[in-house]
């Protein structure tokens, strides 16, 4: 029986971020919708043809999105929140983007992390009046486009249970699972229309099966898939991001034609699926890592697949573990990477080739791919033996860590008193999260410096001028605690990684974070070492320009780890401690330079949490330890801040408190401060700054909205522990909206401060 290869999804952004550029020019009114859609069509077509040329047998259609695939599902199902005023007609691009980005009248829909990745999805909103209807023909048009190119298409849908699970109820006392009977008929209609277009297989993604589901959700799978399996299409139930063997009996009994399992992040589950009788189903093995960029050990994987094929009575397919959305597009575009390191890597285009190599090896025998396997073995040997990887100084420092290295000198209450004596801040102190708008002037100066078109002195002068201006603007607005604005930084991880040993960088290694926002994760390939101070001179200069405190701004060890492509040859906990020691040294240098407030951002802290609760403790233990190692070497008078975003903290608040940061700022505005209730119930002991406005939308909220959120926060939290700040950094915003919003924020804080002190 011939083994097929198929892909679960391909990056949407384009090899040169063409989609980002098209979206942003469209939003600025510099091109029309036809130009935007033409760019999207060109990217989709290029993706299909690339996969076809690589030899992929079944090519995904429906994985592309202009903004987010969950938002696309909301659009396809007509589940538009009432507040956006949809009349029941077809959904326009303006309405689509309004849901994602907000309007002058309506805040954007909430955005949160896609499982434990750095991708973000738009959260569906449900209430008891939510109705579903087939409201878009985009998927069907794309299928017809693919067929016209001779593509063997596999349609891609988010499954009904995952769609409901990832949404939120916007009215109390209502359970979104109760919407399933209304939802399933529309799914049936979609599947029947797909079948009418001649598509045999539908990939129906249910990644929530990697979670510990409550019984009502587990029970609903049988109802859903008995309803959907009407024979119109063959259904490939697709799971990823972890093991699903805790749902083995459920999966065995579901009326689906195939199952996809992730045997890259959870190789141990393969044995369960080979031992149980799944012979009536196609089994797709996600053996190529869809979330990291290391070249696969093809010899070992071919051996594993050969053994699986000999034991599995049904049809076996080869796939990536998950969509390749999380990987850069093509390694061939990297012309400046060290050849040795480049030889260790595989981006999305190369992962297609790895899949087809494994398929050919299974179908035609090992000898048919012997040369490729030999090259793979040599790359693996090179990486294992490379002198770039290991630094004995770093290993010794990690080995010598003691419990004292992760403890502050005294408890928070003592520190708070000393810090208030030092800084004399008012009630409800105002601050920002760190970055300010990256203007064209800033970006041009950085680019010119990288190209040696600016001397070091000229660059220093340009950045200092920007810092002076940012300090001036903050003082003019009336903020209490200032930042230097980060004009010298391109990215909060890349900036530090460029100054640490053990990191490498790409030119075009972009991946989508949300919408048009792309990030270029650095490659953490070896032991991490800080050869010299990274931020001290910038922060010292900023502090010299004002009598108000200026925060030192650092990225925390867990975020440095989570937002990099991390080496897979040692435990992540070890790499986190190496990063923590590098940051600890920077914290010490900042303190010695007279900087009294140091912010260590950990926006990715929850992102690293394993999907199953049984695995949480191990992760939280080492993640908390890493942060405390980074932050605990300072005096009591030095105030440690941290920032976290897009996170549901309800279930990990004890670990957040264990970080023992003096001040935590969090994103709360999109969720209308819902998160604060959890902090109150837990009695969070330290100071907290809940974001009072959403910086991910160009919309500047009314002062009344900010004031109400702030007043609500003051009811939840002791005002003596409350800070006032935006949700996140302001790098992606422009100055006019930034100044307007911050001025409103400061005015609201002053108004409430006066009321509380009256």
UniProtKB/Swiss-Prot annotation:
Record's keyword annotation contains DNA damage: no
This protein's superkingdom?
Bacteria
Recorded catalytic activity of this chain's protein: 5-methyltetrahydropteroyltri-L-glutamate + L-homocysteine = tetrahydropteroyltri-L-glutamate + L-methionine
- List ligand-binding residues for L-homocysteine: 433-435, 486, 601
GO MF annotations, alphabetized? 5-methyltetrahydropteroyltriglutamate-homocysteine S-methyltransferase activity; zinc ion binding
Q: How is the cofactor bound?
A: Binds 1 zinc ion per subunit.
Annotated positions binding 5-methyltetrahydropteroyltri-L-glutamate: 17-20, 113, 517-518, 563, 607
Q: Which residues bind L-methionine?
A: 433-435, 486, 601
- Residue numbers binding Zn(2+): 643, 645, 667, 728
> What keywords are assigned to this protein?
Amino-acid biosynthesis, Metal-binding, Methionine biosynthesis, Methyltransferase, Repeat, Transferase, Zinc
Q: What class of enzyme is it?
A: transferase
Pathway, per UniProt? Answer: Amino-acid biosynthesis; L-methionine biosynthesis via de novo pathway; L-methionine from L-homocysteine (MetE route): step 1/1
A Gene Ontology BP annotation from the UniProt entry = methionine biosynthetic process
Q: What is its EC number?
A: 2.1.1.14
Q: Which cofactor does it need?
A: Zn(2+)
Positions annotated as active site in the UniProt record: 696 (proton donor)
- Report the family membership: Belongs to the vitamin-B12 independent methionine synthase family.
The record's function comment reads:
Catalyzes the transfer of a methyl group from 5-methyltetrahydrofolate to homocysteine resulting in methionine formation.
Protein name according to UniProt? 5-methyltetrahydropteroyltriglutamate--homocysteine methyltransferase
Which organism is this protein's natural source?
Nitrosomonas europaea (strain ATCC 19718 / CIP 103999 / KCTC 2705 / NBRC 14298)
């Amino acid at each position: 029986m011939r083994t097929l290869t198929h892909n679960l999804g391909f990056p949407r952004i384009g090899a040169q971020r063409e989609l980002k550029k098209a979206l942003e020019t469209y939003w600025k009114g510099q091109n029309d919708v036809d130009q935007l859609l033409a760019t999207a069509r060109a990217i989709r077509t290029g993706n299909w043809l690339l996969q076809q040329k690589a030899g992929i047998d079944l090519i995904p259609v429906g994985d592309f999105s202009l903004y987010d695939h969950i938002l696309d599902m909301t659009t396809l199902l007509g589940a538009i929140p009432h507040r956006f005023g949809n009349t029941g007609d077809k959904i326009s691009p303006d309405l689509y983007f309004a849901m994602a980005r907000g309007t002058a009248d309506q805040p954007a829909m909430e955005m949160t992390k896609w499982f434990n990745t750095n991708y973000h999805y738009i959260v569906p909103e449900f209430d008891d009046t939510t109705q579903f209807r087939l409201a878009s023909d985009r998927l069907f048009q794309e299928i017809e486009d693919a067929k016209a190119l001779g593509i063997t298409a596999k349609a891609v849908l988010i499954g009904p249970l995952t769609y409901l699970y990832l949404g939120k109820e916007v009215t109390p006392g209502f359970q979104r699972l109760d919407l399933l009977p209304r939802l399933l008929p529309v799914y049936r209609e979609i599947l029947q229309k797909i079948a009418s277009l001649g598509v045999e297989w539908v990939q129906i993604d249910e990644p929530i099966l990697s979670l510990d589901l409550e019984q009502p959700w587990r029970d609903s799978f049988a109802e859903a898939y008995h309803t959907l399996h009407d024979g119109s299409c063959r259904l490939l139930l697709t799971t990823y991001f972890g093991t699903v063997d805790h749902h083995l009996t459920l999966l065995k009994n579901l009326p689906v034609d195939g199952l996809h399992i992730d045997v890259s992040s959870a190789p141990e589950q393969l044995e369960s699926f080979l031992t149980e009788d799944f012979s009536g189903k196609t089994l797709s093995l996600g053996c190529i890592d869809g979330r990291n960029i290391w070249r696969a050990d093809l010899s070992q994987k071919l051996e594993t697949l050969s053994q699986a094929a000999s034991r599995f009575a049904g049809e076996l397919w080869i796939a990536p573990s998950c969509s390749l959305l999380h990987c850069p597009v093509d390694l061939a575009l990297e012309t400046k990477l060290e050849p040795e390191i480049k030889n260790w890597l595989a981006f999305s285009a190369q992962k297609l080739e790895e899949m087809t190599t494994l398929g050919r090896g299974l179908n035609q025998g090992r000898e048919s791919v012997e040369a490729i396997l030999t090259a793979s073995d040599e790359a693996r040997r090179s990486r294992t033996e490379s002198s770039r990887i290991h630094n004995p100084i770093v290993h010794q420092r990690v080995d010598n860590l003691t419990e004292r290295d992760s403890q502050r000198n005294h408890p928070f209450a003592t520190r708070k008193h000393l810090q208030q004596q030092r800084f004399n801040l008012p009630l409800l102190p105002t601050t920002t999260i760190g970055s300010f708008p990256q203007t064209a002037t800033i970006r041009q100066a950085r680019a010119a410096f990288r190209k040696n078109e600016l001397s070091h002195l000229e660059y220093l002068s340009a950045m200092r001028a920007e810092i002076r201006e940012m300090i001036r603007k903050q003082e003019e607005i009336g903020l209490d605690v200032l930042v230097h604005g980060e004009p010298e930084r391109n990215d909060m991880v890349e900036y530090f990684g460029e100054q640490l040993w053990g990191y490498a960088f790409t030119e075009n290694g972009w991946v989508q974070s949300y919408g048009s926002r792309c990030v270029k994760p650095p490659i953490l390939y070896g032991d991490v070492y800080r050869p010299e101070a990274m931020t001290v001179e910038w922060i010292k200069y900023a502090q010299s320009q004002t009598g108000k405190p200026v925060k030192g701004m650092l990225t925390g060890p867990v975020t440095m780890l989570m937002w990099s492509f991390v080496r897979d040859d040692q435990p992540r906990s070890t790499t986190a401690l190496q990063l923590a020691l590098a940051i600890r040294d920077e914290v010490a240098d900042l303190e010695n330079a007279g900087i009294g407030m140091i912010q260590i951002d950990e926006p990715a802290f929850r992102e690293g949490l394993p999907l199953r609760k049984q695995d949480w403790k191990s992760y939280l233990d080492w993640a908390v330890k890493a942060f405390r190692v980074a932050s605990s070497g300072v005096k009591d008078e030095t105030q440690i801040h941290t920032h976290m975003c897009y996170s549901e903290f309800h279930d990990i608040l004890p670990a957040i408190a264990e970080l023992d940061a003096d001040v935590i700022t969090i994103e709360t505005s999109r969720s209308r401060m819902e998160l604060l209730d959890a902090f109150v119930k837990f009695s969070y002991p330290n100071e907290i700054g809940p974001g009072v406005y959403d910086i991910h939308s160009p919309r500047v909220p009314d002062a009344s909205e900010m004031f109400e959120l702030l007043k609500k926060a003051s009811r939840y939290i002791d005002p003596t522990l409350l800070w006032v700040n935006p949700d996140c950094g302001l790098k992606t915003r422009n100055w006019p909206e930034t100044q307007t919003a911050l001025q409103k924020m400061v005015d609201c804080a002053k108004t409430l401060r006066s009321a509380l002190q009256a």
